[in-house]
Regions:
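Hydrophobic faces of well-ordered beta-strands that scaffold small-molecule active sites
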Residues: 1-3, 54-59, 71, 79-81, ...
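Alpha-helix-loop-beta-strand connector modules within alpha/beta enzyme cores
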Residues: 17-25, 47-49, 97-120, 160
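Glycine-rich phosphate-binding active-site loops on the catalytic face of alpha/beta enzymes
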Residues: 2-15, 79-90, 137-156
Length: 161
């Protein structure tokens, strides 16, 4: 489960707790729901806590500076750095190539490595994707589904105009 805009360890703990059943968390219990085959999986609640993957998005300068504390929260399985909101948080909206934005991304990755936690990032640019892989990001999302669909539709439309 991906949690957006987590800035500190308190918010990270809240995210984790919302995915865990009592007594480890506050997730609501529904005995006859699809996730446990409508009540037929007898040990579902015992297994569920261990099978959830919690990834928090660090999308501000404050979050980048707090990554070590966020990563230390038990149950946080990964960090995803969000360049769009990160650039906006420092008054440079949409300026992903800006030196300060890239410096914060590098700091975030460095803090993830020091904390031994997987780090991910999103970019629409191939050269940045290659750079992020080379830098050591665990996973790199290249572009978005909506952008890919829109560009494909534009190219198809050009073909028939």
């Amino acid at each position: 489960i991906l949690f957006p805009y987590v800035e500190d360890e308190k918010e990270a703990l809240s995210a984790v707790e919302s995915t865990r059943y009592p007594p480890k968390g506050i997730r609501g219990v529904m005995s006859a729901a699809r996730m446990n085959k409508y009540g037929t999986v007898t040990d579902y609640y015992k297994k569920a806590d261990d099978e959830i993957c919690v990834i928090v998005q660090c999308e501000s300068k404050k979050a980048i500076q707090n990554i070590s504390k966020i990563a230390a929260v038990e149950g946080v399985d990964g960090i995803f750095i969000g360049p769009s909101d990160l650039s906006a948080s420092i008054g440079k909206i949409g300026q992903f190539e800006d030196e300060e934005v890239q410096s914060l991304i590098s700091l975030g990755l460095e803090n993830c490595k020091k904390s031994n936690i997987p780090a991910g990032i999103l970019t629409a640019k191939r050269d940045f994707a290659k750079k992020y892989v080379a830098d050591g990001f665990t996973y790199v999302a290249i572009n978005s589904d909506t952008n890919l669909i829109a560009r494909s539709a534009e190219n198809l439309l050009k073909e028939f105009k």
